[in-house]
């Protein structure tokens, strides 16, 4: 893509600027570790976000956020996945593809400059509203009839064009995902080696067969005009409270290509690709609250951001150690695959781990507690352990309990 998406402006910080209302944030960096760190920082500092954006206010923030970003070639795996079985690490290393383990659940995905990443943040569970914004974007601006499928996918003609994952911290909800525009689908199988059992039930043989680029449906769609459309629909969705945004957002297309921004390296991030999704511009009207963030922003100098960034780059976090365990069981459930490794020492369950692409990371975290609570390797004690677990998805827990007890 040769065109440069110039969407955001420098914010002029003053008490006169409107500080309430939905925010649109865009990352001017294409490094996966940078963007995941930024996303996690926004999630954990949601209520204090205005001060980190240098807006002169004492208000606590509690409005919807749309965060748009894009990455160079990267493999991103779910928090609880086994990277050794999900990825072809030899090919990944040879081609210089970055690998990251995100902070949310779900499966392994491939990113490049042919897809747009979105993040919705809110203090309410608004997944249905978020999906509606995306569906309206595709229908109203590109004449693409898409639909939700399951809990986390958007499909066109029964092929997946978007996948999502979710996370909650305190009273803040995160919904993030990707939208495939012109992804290099032909190399998905080069880097990803997902369990074939996922595709047997779909009657297909590869990741490629299940996914579709939106450019295959409408060849006029690009990452840049999709983002403009998303901002329009996001603002339109909340127009009852913020009508002034709609009156001014029409100026976006006319002013997109007016200026450039030259990035400067600050924290040793390789972001030299010229095909930037966004560049700084001063042309968006002041009453549209859009902020750009790059590696020169104050947020990226914050110790908490740097902690996330260094963690994501850490080998132990990303790859982890998968020792040879005495016991290995796995099963594909409707909510995801579970793979358990554990040792039994002196009749007790020890030294284990659970790998999963399940979106409910709280369920997996609770299940992992079996490895550090001196649980006897017996049906009775394991059954008692499961009864004490306090999780939201009781049905999922019952399925896992029945399976493990059957495997003993």
UniProtKB/Swiss-Prot annotation:
CDD domains: LplA. It is an enzyme of class 6 (ligase). Mg(2+) binds at residue 153. PROSITE patterns: BPL_LPL_CATALYTIC (PS51733). GO terms for cellular component: cytoplasm; mitochondrion. It catalyses: L-lysyl-[lipoyl-carrier protein] + (R)-lipoate + ATP = N(6)-[(R)-lipoyl]-L-lysyl-[lipoyl-carrier protein] + AMP + diphosphate + H(+); (R)-dihydrolipoate + L-lysyl-[lipoyl-carrier protein] + ATP = N(6)-[(R)-dihydrolipoyl]-L-lysyl-[lipoyl-carrier protein] + AMP + diphosphate + H(+); (R)-dihydrolipoate + ATP + H(+) = N(6)-[(R)-dihydrolipoyl]-5'-AMP + diphosphate; N(6)-[(R)-dihydrolipoyl]-5'-AMP + L-lysyl-[lipoyl-carrier protein] = N(6)-[(R)-dihydrolipoyl]-L-lysyl-[lipoyl-carrier protein] + AMP + 2 H(+). One of its GO terms (biological process) is protein lipoylation. (R)-lipoate binds at residues 107, 160. Residues 60-242 form the BPL/LPL catalytic domain. It holds the Pfam family LplA-B_cat. Pathway: Protein modification; protein lipoylation via exogenous pathway; protein N(6)-(lipoyl)lysine from lipoate: step 1/2; Protein modification; protein lipoylation via exogenous pathway; protein N(6)-(lipoyl)lysine from lipoate: step 2/2. Changing residue 160 to A: Loses the ability to form the reaction intermediate lipoyl-AMP resulting in a loss of catalytic activity. Abolishes lipoylation of GCVH/H-protein. Abolishes lipoylation of BCKDH-E2/BCDH and KDH in the presence of LipL2. ATP binds at residues 102, 107, 110, 160. It comes from the Eukaryota. Its main location: mitochondrion. Residues 1-18 form a transit peptide. Keywords: ATP-binding, Ligase, Magnesium, Metal-binding, Mitochondrion, Nucleotide-binding, Transit peptide. It is found in: Mitochondrion. Catalyzes both the ATP-dependent activation of exogenously supplied lipoate to lipoyl-AMP and the transfer of the activated lipoyl onto the lipoyl domains of lipoate-dependent enzymes. In the mitochondrion, functions as a redox switch between two lipoylation routes. Senses the oxidation state of lipoate and determines which downstream enzymes will be lipoylated. In low reducing conditions, uses lipoate in its oxidized ring form to lipoylate glycine cleavage system H-protein GCVH. Belongs to the LplA family. This is Lipoate--protein ligase 1.
